[in-house]
């Protein structure tokens, strides 16, 4: 009986772990990161929160535009090949609307892809004209698995939600890196508190 319980526990753990998607052989990487906050944003481990309004504090090293921010900036910089991010996003509380939870930056040109969440739980592409990626999956209390696959050589970017391909767009050339956390979009506002868990990075 004990052995069966152990097997079940291990199976449950495996089911919860985020895995790379999209086919092919992926090699796991472990990039470091820098914590970036601005205007009252707070990072505690893997939990990210921003207030309803800017606090007036420009400390945190990431306040060039004055938006509220609580993010990790990963040092996974790349300019060619295939690169994948995966993680589980939980919305702990949300009293605002239209907040970024994941960004892929095109070097000094800024983000070319921003994954945003609306108060109704929709995930959407902020930079892609506000196109809905997945409806209602990221409501308060929900956990959603997100994978992004960027083929920098082919200039293609894809987003998987809960294991299903939901969004594909063309990508520019250049150098890239990823951020996760919370960041107020131009049309959005906090407060919001989220947790990113089981985060992984892979390359081909």
Language model features with spans:
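Short, aromatic/His-centered strand-loop micro-motif at the edge of beta-sheets
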Residues: 21-24, 122-145
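Short strand-turn-strand beta-turns centered on an Asx-Gly dipeptide
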Residues: 160-164
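Extracellular glycan-recognition surfaces and repeat-rich motifs
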Residues: 28-50
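Flexible, surface-exposed loop/gating regions in the mature catalytic domains
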Residues: 113-114, 137-149, 172
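Secretory/extracellular carbohydrate-interaction modules
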Residues: 42-121
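Ligand-recognition surfaces built from glycine- and aromatic
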Residues: 19-24, 77-89, 96-107, 170-204
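Short tryptophan-centered beta-strand motifs in secreted/extracellular beta-sheet-rich domains
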Residues: 87, 141-151, 157-159
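Fungal secretory targeting signals
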Residues: 1-17
